Regions:
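CN hydrolase (nitrilase-like) catalytic-core segments centered on the catalytic cysteine
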Residues: 90, 115, 256, 264-286, ...
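Short, conserved active-site loops that position catalytic residues or coordinate cofactors/metal ions
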Residues: 23-38, 56, 62-67, 214-215, ...
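Cytoplasmic C-terminal tails of single-pass
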Residues: 492-498
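Active-site catalytic loop in hydrolytic enzyme cores
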Residues: 72-81, 117, 126-154, 298-371, ...
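Soluble catalytic regions of membrane-associated enzymes that act on cell-envelope
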Residues: 196-322, 352-356, 362, 366-368, ...
């Protein structure tokens, strides 16, 4: 059986790797289309169980390449088990996708229904298990391509469906090139992409000058456990440099200063931070491990005002599994170095904070992968996205660029400028159309000072994105169910001789 399947296995392995190559730091977004063309060819004409197996191989090849940064992070102390283990678990979702595609492929316009069916597994991936792990969604690899403007209509789910559909349609046409009707979905996708307007970047509620302080962190992996004082000192030092540049007139005085995630640990009292804020005379948004009580610590963004100190804060809602919350500690002690730490307390309020005369929507690092966090903040009045992150744990691998791509997609999805403040890079300022105004390098102290537009108009994705996501997933599942029923009917007719 394996010998007979060898060409299909080779196709899905190559397809999984090509899907990974579509993601930043590379700009070859089109390899995702080739990846899904190969997947469609491999799944054509196979039974559901075999399609699930091929989908799993496709997914394992993708995640093994895409999550290599986990090996860079933990490999020295834990070997390949966390990296390979997570890749195997995540491969279960494309396995489900492959099975659903095999069912939906029995319908007319099969490539389109198949794309909806495959994308339905991303809906599940964002929710299960342990509240999901939505890393590596197809849409996040499209920030350099023509599909990106679709995010303003249907968010990441629509972008994913469009890319998968493009690959499936191309493969279906190549399988039967004499059937002109096979070109119809391809032409339709092209026309839709041409019709979608470029996201506007103009200000609707004035502008703000924002300073992003990247204090830097040592590239020491797990040694960061004991580097808290260094991170705080580095942020204070780079802020002092910023204050000197403002006083000398080298840069404009910002309206808002942003510090990255985990810049300090605090209970809201820190005289040195007070002095730094007072020296510039403008409010700060500071990423901090915030001691909210005797046993409660939040991963938070704190508004720090001149003269009055720490004020309102937002607590991270979507905590990193096995990092900020540890399930099954007796087992996971062999997979994560964070097992000795107490779980962070998750927040429950939307990520929106009043600061610098406006309302800022915020998500902290990993949360950017979830659709609802920034959507809720923007719907609650956020006119600017601020995304503090700490990528210092993961070295110089691709994790930083994968996360930055998510932030770029969210800017387009909500029609907002985005400010990414990273502890060790890459920090960035992003326009509402997803283009990068400025960014820093990795493992260097630096500060960005840029003027950003404030926008108030809500995109279709912000207003209706949740319903759109559920609708796409439901359509995919219904297509698979219809294909299953159609197959049952055909078998019934065959068995009765009808």
């Amino acid at each position: 059986m394996v010998k007979a399947l060898a060409p299909r296995i080779a196709a899905v392995v190559v397809g999984g790797v090509l899907l990974h190559l579509a993601f930043p730091p590379r700009t070859v977004w089109w390899t995702a289309i080739v990846a899904f063309a190969l997947l469609w060819w491999a799944l054509s004409g196979v039974r559901v169980r075999r399609a699930a197996w091929l989908g799993a191989v496709f997914g394992f090849a993708f995640y093994l390449a895409h999550l290599m940064w986990i090996q860079d992070f933990l490999g020295r102390d834990y070997g390949p088990f966390p990296w390979v283990g997570l890749s195997l678990v995540m491969a279960g979702f494309p396995a489900l996708g492959g099975a659903l595609v095999a069912l939906a492929a029995r319908l007319p316009a099969a490539p389109v229904w198949g794309a909806l069916a495959f994308a339905a597994q991303e809906w599940l991936q964002s929710r299960f298990p342990l509240n999901g792990f939505p890393w590596g969604r197809v849409a996040f690899g499209q920030v350099e391509g023509p599909f990106l403007p679709l995010a303003a209509i249907g968010g990441a789910p629509l972008v994913s469906v469009a890319v998968v559909a493009a690959g499936f349609c191309v493969a279906a046409f190549l399988q039967r090139p004499r059937r002109v009707v096979g070109l119809v979905p391809v032409v339709a996708i092209v026309l839709v992409l041409l019709a979608v307007p470029t996201p506007p970047v103009d200000a609707q509620d004035g502008t703000r000058t924002v300073a992003v302080v990247q204090g830097n962190a040592p590239d020491i992996g797990l040694g960061l456990f004991s580097a808290g004082r260094t991170l705080r000192a580095n942020s204070l030092a780079e802020t002092s440099v910023l204050a000197d540049r403002v006083r000398s007139g080298a840069v404009a005085r910002p309206d808002l200063v942003v510090w990255p995630e985990s810049s300090l640990s605090t209970d809201g009292v820190d005289p040195a931070v007070d002095r730094a804020v007072d020296a510039l005379g403008v409010p700060f948004l500071i990423g901090a491990n915030y001691e909210a009580g005797a046993t409660d610590t939040e991963n938070a963004v704190v508004v720090w005002n001149p003269g009055t100190g720490a004020g309102e804060r937002y607590a991270k809602q979507e905590l990193v599994p096995f990092g900020e919350r540890i399930p099954l500690r007796a087992v996971t002690q062999y997979l994560t170095p964070f097992v000795a730490l107490a779980d962070f307390t998750p927040g429950t309020a939307p990520g929106v904070l009043p600061v610098a005369g406006t309302r800022v929507a915020t998500a902290i690092c990993y949360e950017t992968a979830y659709d609802h966090v920034l959507r809720d903040g923007v719907a609650d009045g956020g006119s600017l996205l601020v995304i503090p992150t700490n990528n210092a744990w993961y070295g110089r691998g691709e994790m930083t660029w994968q996360h930055l791509a998510m932030s770029r997609l969210r800017a387009v999805e909500h029609g907002r400028a985005a400010v990414v403040a990273a502890l060790s890079g890459a920090s960035a300022v992003i326009r509402p159309d997803g283009s990068v105004v400025a960014r820093t390098g990795l493992y260097t102290a630096d500060t960005l000072v840029e003027q950003v537009p404030l926008r108030t108009e809500l995109t279709f994705a912000t207003r209706w994105g949740a319903w759109f996501e559920h609708g796409l997933a439901l359509a995919g599942l219904l297509a698979a169910a219809a294909g299953y029923l159609l197959r049952r009917r055909e078998l019934s007719r065959t068995s009765t001789g009808a």
